[in-house]
Swiss-Prot record:
Descriptive protein name: Methionine import ATP-binding protein MetN
Residues annotated to bind ATP: G38, A39, S40, G41, A42, G43, K44, S45
Function noted in UniProt: Part of the ABC transporter complex MetNIQ involved in methionine import. Responsible for energy coupling to the transport system.
Topology within the bilayer: Peripheral membrane protein
Subcellular location: Cell inner membrane
Gene, per the UniProt record: metN
Gene3D superfamilies: 3.30.70.260, P-loop containing nucleotide triphosphate hydrolases
Enzyme class, UniProt record, top EC level: translocase
Entry EC number(s): 7.4.2.11
Keyword Cell membrane part of the UniProt annotation: yes
Cystines in this chain: none
A GO term from the CC aspect: Gram-negative-bacterium-type cell wall
Organism: Haemophilus influenzae (strain ATCC 51907 / DSM 11121 / KW20 / Rd)
Catalyzed reactions: L-methionine(out) + ATP + H2O = L-methionine(in) + ADP + phosphate + H(+); D-methionine(out) + ATP + H2O = D-methionine(in) + ADP + phosphate + H(+)
Chain ranges of the ABC transporter domain: 2-241
């Protein structure tokens, strides 16, 4: 449905050239939800704006539903864009128009009949849960309600693709959850292909089928959500996955934690990161028995993404130095990421 081939985007600045996108290729199948994740300034917004040619690529091709947009005339592009809806971090609603009138605007611009507009917009407001707000003005809506209006407006022309540019980043956590649930429902019921960009791995984890990681204008990793969470190949992907966890040491341990052991009875506090099959295997128990070490679990968390389990365990590991080293090597050989957080006295 969406195919980006070797996209490059270079901005000409007064004193230099800025490469925002560098040879980016991405293929999104019909009906998928794909998330592009990256830090601020990584090129996410430029990438999504290249899909509907709000930003024209310096080189490369953009193909949507079999049509190469980069070869279209201006008039042909206007028509092709009707198949591509878009929502933004900021809702861009017209304050002088009601909810109904804001959603109806694309159909009015297409000179649709009043009867069709009435029927279509009524159905869309029902879909996004705003039937009772049809006559309200944007100033009387919450942030989540405004984004629902923007989503309904983006769907008014029956697009095949919906682009979401940081659509939840200005919303509180509860509202974010409701908007993500709505996007998932729209994808399921209407079969719309969704491309979203975000800096939050939690968003990707919750609704995406596919994920691409962007860094300094390059796609550094991509695959299904399950593949990336089970076996992240780049440090950046690993960092984003870790950000979905909220685990910390008890205060008494934090207060006594040192970077190096102060004496022979100072034992390491180790974080073990499990993904895929290593989550279900009793590896810590096996290591304890095999090497004669004692593991006192301080905190642990397991989660799911794309049908794959992943998680962390932090433990105090007691034993002689050789046994602890052998334990770490054994776990790493079994695809467990091992990180020594410090030592307790």
């Amino acid at each position: 449905m969406i195919k980006l081939n070797n996209i490059x985007k270079i901005f000409e600045l007064p004193x230099k050239k800025l490469t925002a996108l560098d040879n980016v290729s991405l293929n999104i199948e019909k009906g998928q939800i794909c998330g592009v994740i990256g830090a601020s300034g990584a090129g996410k917004s430029t990438l999504i704006r290249c899909v509907n040619l709000l930003e024209k690529p310096t080189s490369g091709s953009v193909i949507v539903d079999g049509v190469e947009l980069t070869k279209l005339s201006d008039r042909e592009l206007v028509l092709a864009r009707r198949q591509i809806g878009m929502i933004f971090q900021h809702f861009n609603l017209l304050s002088s128009r009601t909810v109904f009138e804001n959603v109806a605007l694309p159909l009015e611009l297409e000179s649709e009949s009043k009867a069709k507009i009435q029927e279509k917009i009524t159905a869309l407001l029902d879909l996004v849960g705003l039937s009772e707000k049809r006559d309200a003005y944007p100033s009387n809506l919450s942030g989540g309600q405004k984004q629902r209006v923007a989503i309904a407006r983006a769907l008014a022309s029956d697009p095949k693709v919906l682009l979401c540019d940081e659509a939840t980043s200005a919303l509180d956590p509860a509202t974010t959850q409701s908007i993500l649930k709505l996007l998932k429902e729209i994808n399921r019921t209407l079969g719309i292909t969704i491309l979203l960009i975000t800096h939050e791995m939690e968003v990707v984890k919750q609704i995406c089928d596919q994920v691409a990681v962007i860094d300094q204008g390059r796609l550094v990793e991509q695959g299904t959500v399950g593949e990336i969470f089970a076996n992240p190949k780049t440090e950046l992907a690993q960092e984003f996955i870790r950000s979905t966890f909220h685990i910390s040491l008890p205060d008494e341990y934090l207060e006594n934690l040192t970077d190096t052991p102060k004496h022979s009875k100072a034992y390491p506090i180790i974080k073990f990161e499990f993904t895929g099959r290593s989550v279900d295997a009793p590896l810590l128990s096996q290591a304890s028995k095999k090497f004669g070490v004692e593991l006192s679990i301080l905190t642990s968390q397991i989660d799911y993404a794309g049908g794959v389990k992943f998680g962390y365990t932090i433990a105090e590991v007691e034993g002689d130095e050789d046994a602890i080293t052998q334990t770490k090597v054994y776990l790493m050989e079994n695809n467990v990421r091992v990180e020594v957080l410090g030592y307790v006295q």
